[in-house]
UniProtKB/Swiss-Prot annotation:
InterPro entries: Creatin/AminoP/Spt16_N, Creatinase/aminopeptidase-like, Creatinase_N, Pept_M24, Pept_M24B, Peptidase_M24_C, Peptidase_M24B_aminopep-P_CS, X-Pro_aminopeptidase_P. Keywords: Acetylation, Aminopeptidase, Cytoplasm, Hydrolase, Manganese, Metal-binding, Metalloprotease, Protease. It comes from Homo sapiens. Expressed in all tissues tested, including pancreas, heart, muscle, kidney, liver, lung and brain. Highest levels in pancreas. Belongs to the peptidase M24B family. The lineage of its organism: Eukaryota, Metazoa, Chordata, Craniata, Vertebrata. This is Xaa-Pro aminopeptidase 1. Optimum pH is 8.2. Its main location: cytoplasm. Inhibited by apstatin and the metal ion chelators EDTA and 1,10-phenanthroline. Partially inhibited by dithiothreitol. Not inhibited by enalaprilat or amastatin. Specifically inhibited by the pseudodipeptide CQ31. Inhibition by CQ31 indirectly activates the CARD8 inflammasome: dipeptide accumulation following PEPD inactivation weaky inhibit dipeptidyl peptidases DDP8 and DPP9, relieving DPP8- and/or DPP9-mediated inhibition of CARD8. It catalyses: Release of any N-terminal amino acid, including proline, that is linked to proline, even from a dipeptide or tripeptide. Signal peptide: none annotated. Gene3D superfamilies: Creatinase/methionine aminopeptidase superfamily (3.90.230.10), Creatinase/prolidase N-terminal domain (3.40.350.10).
Amino acid sequence: MPPKVTSELLRQLRQAMRNSEYVTEPIQAYIIPSGDAHQSEYIAPCDCRRAFVSGFDGSAGTAIITEEHAAMWTDGRYFLQAAKQMDSNWTLMKMGLKDTPTQEDWLVSVLPEGSRVGVDPLIIPTDYWKKMAKVLRSAGHHLIPVKENLVDKIWTDRPERPCKPLLTLGLDYTGISWKDKVADLRLKMAERNVMWFVVTALDEIAWLFNLRGSDVEHNPVFFSYAIIGLETIMLFIDGDRIDAPSVKEHLLLDLGLEAEYRIQVHPYKSILSELKALCADLSPREKVWVSDKASYAVSETIPKDHRCCMPYTPICIAKAVKNSAESEGMRRAHIKDAVALCELFNWLEKEVPKGGVTEISAADKAEEFRRQQADFVDLSFPTISSTGPNGAIIHYAPVPETNRTLSLDEVYLIDSGAQYKDGTTDVTRTMHFGTPTAYEKECFTYVLKGHIAVSAAVFPTGTKGHLLDSFARSALWDSGLDYLHGTGHGVGSFLNVHEGPCGISYKTFSDEPLEAGMIVTDEPGYYEDGAFGIRIENVVLVVPVKTKYNFNNRGSLTFEPLTLVPIQTKMIDVDSLTDKECDWLNNYHLTCRDVIGKELQKQGRQEALEWLIRETQPISKQH
């Protein structure tokens, strides 16, 4: 697929940068981040401004346009994809590589003296603004809020903002009512002497009110803001969806609730004006709590003396620690998901040798099998179905122009997941339908060793995820190999497939200590550009574990795999595994056979059951 031609769009954007209708004085650079007004990773079509301007549609990236240059910063997941999707107007800035300048350093190096750099304050996170403004100011430049989004001005056929119906979740799924969640939040606010809390992240609002939506594809969220006071609840949401009988009943809107649980509903776009009015009535010592990831427009509406900024909100942390109802729901969801994947892999083994299966048809088949499971709602992200060289594109999504046929000669990687009412799944398996080469087996085995090292790890309570990242890379590092993405991310409970604040990574989502009840992925990989990609991913639950000793009474933790899908033994160089690694894999496969076998039997899926039994035969080293 040829890259998008962007010359005319860039000309129009540069013209807008000088247009007095939009800016009081011309700006010399314009920043276009990935996110929306809620700093979401996955966004609605109406918010895909960076993709519209550049052609690059990966989930992470920041574009900066000056009079002379157009540059795109993205991370290692997207280097290959961005290079393919952008035309020659663009310079790709590969984040994480030592020779790549930061965005602010690059701007300082290319801008004329005393330049003005513009950005839409509603879609830029506060922490990003502060960092950028500080560096620019020290070099004699200025970061300017441009309230009219300049991309919107040149995007003539921009889609409408979605406003789809809401889904209510009962206690069987959530384990705790929305009123109790609000009460818990108010306790956290009182501990910090905070009167008000502004909620801007879409998944936090969905979690708090036990509601789900479908405004963003694959992410069960809805466009909204909330302001929680010690005695007030304000919800900012558009459309008549709040008037649906099930939603009114769920939120108790028609009942004469005690005042502190009565929800005041406001239009979505009135958040800044209502927040401004609220702040105007604050007494001198009253504080308003807001995430430093909230937009600059929201945080700047709160006067500095009243503003309390924190990296992670109490909702973010509470949401990450799943209660027993959520953990059980996630277990159920992963059992259903494993059934669908056993069906898929059995089907692929029969059909691939016939030569008619493509990356797209395999992805479609995976969705078809998932849709047969109870409480299926949607996929949790676009399926990464990739064979041969396409597997080396870490976040590859097949399109007709790139769609390869699966064969007996190439490694096949499928990274996929689903949203069920009781949980969110995300699983990657890499397999070969013919005979893998010795090098493919070698690389796969290094990745498997890393996967096992993380999954079997026992670590003290309070350990941060970044300390486990090297466990996953050690076998690869020993051979001079590595991968350019984190090892794991948090996973929501029928919410976003990527969630903070926990994870296993050398960078993102690794700041908060892991604690029992958190759910993360374990997904090391290896990618040979132009040849193949390998990744093995399970979703795992952090659980307590008893150890021989208990230093300082702090306790220990380990991981329970929730994903129960066989790992193809054909791809393993078994003699390179230790006895402990062989035991781990055999025990894992025994659990897959026991748990998923029962469900396959219950659903009458005999062929898939036979496939499961074949794929979970124990391995042993040739001594």
